[in-house]
A protein has these predicted regions:
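PLP-dependent class I/II
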Residues: 1-16, 27-31, 35, 39-57, ...
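Conserved N-terminal alpha-helix of the aminotransferase class I/II PLP-enzyme fold
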Residues: 66-100
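A short acidic, glycine-rich active-site loop
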Residues: 61-65
Length: 391
């Protein structure tokens, strides 16, 4: 067979599949009257005062390159935001970097941190982006099953994974509150993990994009609270301020690490959109508490779905953050998550994401996004009930 130019492309790219989340969402779009609870897209609009700040920036012709790390005022605003919200102290001049969404923050951090052959612990089920990015860096992802420990990584499980992999672990990737499970870590759980991370001189790459969407009495805690020198914190405004399309994220780390990540960021994207940065500055200052009303609504939706799905026989590790339910398919139903979701879409015209999209440890589960109006969720549960009960 004649070789094509494609055959000579980066072998890691050729071996990576398109995100199953996007793939499945597109596949079910053609089903008539389909009701989709598939994507992590807030159904709220960006707050008006943030949009007006961007409009003002356009009118004032703030439409040129900014500094690679971001506008100085924005970096100061992010530093103040993180200190107020999470009691973290970072120097805006040397320890914070503005990125094109948290996704670029994750990619730039991974590509900067890892060498070929480095081993990286990844608790699973896990968001789809991390493992492909680790492989692009030609590092080795080591997934650790958390489905039997409440969807959180315990210090004991982490120690066991380090031992079984032969030690010499370079990094761990943590996402909390979690996509897909909605589960987050308590303060004491993070503190215990931090001790293991420091003991083994590991780097913790922490995606905390859902930090403003936590439910219950305990607020979000960052790994940097317990192991700042070991931690790269990635955050942003997509979920907290309903700004997914604005593409603004942040990386916070020690100055020597930020200095190196900045090189990767510079050659990937140069800088974040100037207008998006104007909007972001408004978000982290005047909009510091914009997430509160959204959080209240998300919590109502979470409680509704949790109760309805539990009644139908789904087992759920109670989600304390983000806007996802990760539910174990009831006994007596199709246990292959892909087959279950395809059948559900065909028969009930309801689209949710198969758990296998989040690693083999997610098999037998489905992910439901409740970033949707309550009326839509109520109809979704009517369809789910009809399907499960065979009506």
């Amino acid at each position: 067979m004649e070789q094509t130019l494609r055959d000579g492309l980066n072998d890691q790219i050729l071996s990576i599949e398109v995100s199953l989340i996007r793939k499945f969402d597109e596949q079910t779009s053609d089903v008539p009257d389909i009701l989709k609870l598939t994507l992590g897209e807030p159904d709220f609009n960006t707050p008006e005062h943030i949009k007006q700040a961007a409009i003002k920036g356009i009118e004032e012709n703030f439409t040129h390159y900014t500094a690679n790390a971001g506008m100085p005022d924005l970096l100061k605003g992010v530093a103040a935001f993180m200190k107020t919200k999470y009691h973290l102290n970072y120097d805006p001049a040397s320890e914070i970097l503005t990125t094109v969404g948290a996704e670029e923050g994750v990619a730039a951090s991974i590509l900067t941190a890892l060498n070929p052959g480095d081993k990286v612990i990844v608790p699973s089920p896990i968001y789809t982006a991390y493992v492909p990015l680790i492989r692009l860096a030609r590092a080795v992802p080591i997934t650790v099953d958390t489905s039997d420990t409440g969807m959180v990584l315990t210090p004991e499980r982490l120690e066991k994974a380090i031992e079984e992999s032969g030690g010499d672990i370079k990094a761990i990737v943590l996402n909390y509150p979690s996509n897909p499970t909605g589960v987050t870590y308590l303060k004491e759980e993070l503190a215990a993990l931090a001790e293991v991370i420091k003991k083994h001189h590991m780097l913790a790459i922490c995606d905390e994009i859902y930090s403003e969407l936590t439910y219950g009495d305990e607020p979000h805690h960052s790994m940097a609270e317990f192991a700042k020198e070991n931690t790269i914190v990635i955050n942003g405004l997509s979920k907290s301020h309903a700004m997914t399309g604005w593409r603004v994220g942040f990386i916070l780390a020690s100055a020597d690490i930020i200095k190196e990540i900045r090189k990767t960021h510079m050659y990937l994207v140069s800088s974040t959109s100037s207008i998006s940065q104007k909007a972001a500055l408004e978000a982290v200052t005047a909009g510091i508490d914009d997430a509160l009303e959204m959080r209240k609504e998300y919590q109502k939706r979470r409680d509704f779905l949790y109760e309805k799905l539990s009644t139908l026989g789904f087992e759920i590790a109670r989600p304390n953050g983000a806007f996802y339910i990760f539910a174990k398919i009831p006994a007596g139903q199709i246990q292959d998550s892909m087959q279950f979701c395809v059948d559900l879409a065909k028969k009930a015209h309801l689209s949710v994401i198969p758990g296998i999209a989040f690693g083999k440890e997610g098999e037998g589960y489905i992910r439901i996004s409740y970033a949707a109006a309550m009326e839509k969720l109520e109809e979704a549960m009517r369809r789910m009930e009809s399907y499960i009960l065979g009506k």
